[in-house]
Amino acid sequence: MNPLYQKHIISINDLSREELELVLDTAAKLKANPQPELLKHKVIASCFFEASTRTRLSFETSMHRLGASVVGFSDSSNTSLGKKGETLADTISVISTYVDAIVMRHPQEGAARLATEFSGGIPILNAGDGANQHPTQTLLDLFTIQETQGQLENLNIAMVGDLKYGRTVHSLAQALAKFNGNRFYFIAPTALAMPQYILDMLDEKGITWSQHASIEEVMGEVDILYMTRVQKERLDPSEYANVKAQFVLRASDLEGARTNMKVLHPLPRIDEIATDVDKTPHAWYFQQAGNGIFARQALLALVLNRELAL
């Protein structure tokens, strides 16, 4: 029996290691062997209460390439919720009577979890709820790491930039902590350091981690360099100018890197990765974004199919 059938996917913590491996294995099979009719006759709602480019287009492309019909909206201001003041609960209650699954993004933390209470058993897939969770980003990150490194264990992973507010690094650390032998290097200004609850979680699992002031300190040791954008609005102007210069990756910084090392980024990048990095064999952020199709296809296929034969 497929353990993800009709399951809500709200947080990466909703998935066990075995379920993560099932999603990644399914993603690899779908990448190697497209299934254009796998979700034929299924109707999926794409409900984006908050603006999105990559996530919405990636999800909707995933739906279409599996043969599903797609309904929904990309701007809630033109819906009854936006124009007439309808509650999220009522909106989800109605939409769930039309479709087989609901993909939703919402600016309010906890909105996706709330939606599960009103969906009548129709699975909710969280495409991002405020600064809280973005589980499908984590799935495509894991898929890319496994694809480039051949494993998800015994890896050295550096995370750089805004580690305090960046939901992608929190979820990725939690997911990778389910696999043995990984070591983390956290590179961030003090004001944007990894939250204590993540560090405590790693300590409880006996996972080694360390904090560093610059990328150069760890370049020769890591398999994955996960860059994030330092958000200007989080720092005072003088501190931002200093931090911005300190956490920029250039091609010249990669000279001592391992040959297998890949640079990842959840995108959009601003100027934290110089464009000269794009031409190096280490740059993998555009392929990473492309892998979102297969990770999301896998999740949709598993949630909607009792038995998945690929």
Curated annotation (Swiss-Prot):
Annotated protein name in UniProt: Aspartate carbamoyltransferase catalytic subunit
InterPro entries noted in UniProt: Asp/Orn_carbamoyltranf_P-bd, Asp/Orn_carbamoylTrfase, Asp/Orn_carbamoylTrfase_sf, Asp_carbamoyltransf, Asp_carbamoyltransf_Asp/Orn-bd
Role, per record: Catalyzes the condensation of carbamoyl phosphate and aspartate to form carbamoyl aspartate and inorganic phosphate, the committed step in the de novo pyrimidine nucleotide biosynthesis pathway.
Residues bound to L-aspartate: K84, R167, R229
PROSITE patterns: CARBAMOYLTRANSFERASE (PS00097)
Pfam families: OTCace, OTCace_N
SUPFAM superfamilies according to UniProt: Aspartate/ornithine carbamoyltransferase
Pathway terms, separated by semicolons: Pyrimidine metabolism; UMP biosynthesis via de novo pathway; (S)-dihydroorotate from bicarbonate: step 2/3
Family (UniProt): Belongs to the aspartate/ornithine carbamoyltransferase superfamily. ATCase family.
Reaction(s) this enzyme catalyzes, per UniProt: carbamoyl phosphate + L-aspartate = N-carbamoyl-L-aspartate + phosphate + H(+)
Keywords assigned: Pyrimidine biosynthesis, Transferase
Lineage: Bacteria, Pseudomonadati, Pseudomonadota, Gammaproteobacteria, Enterobacterales
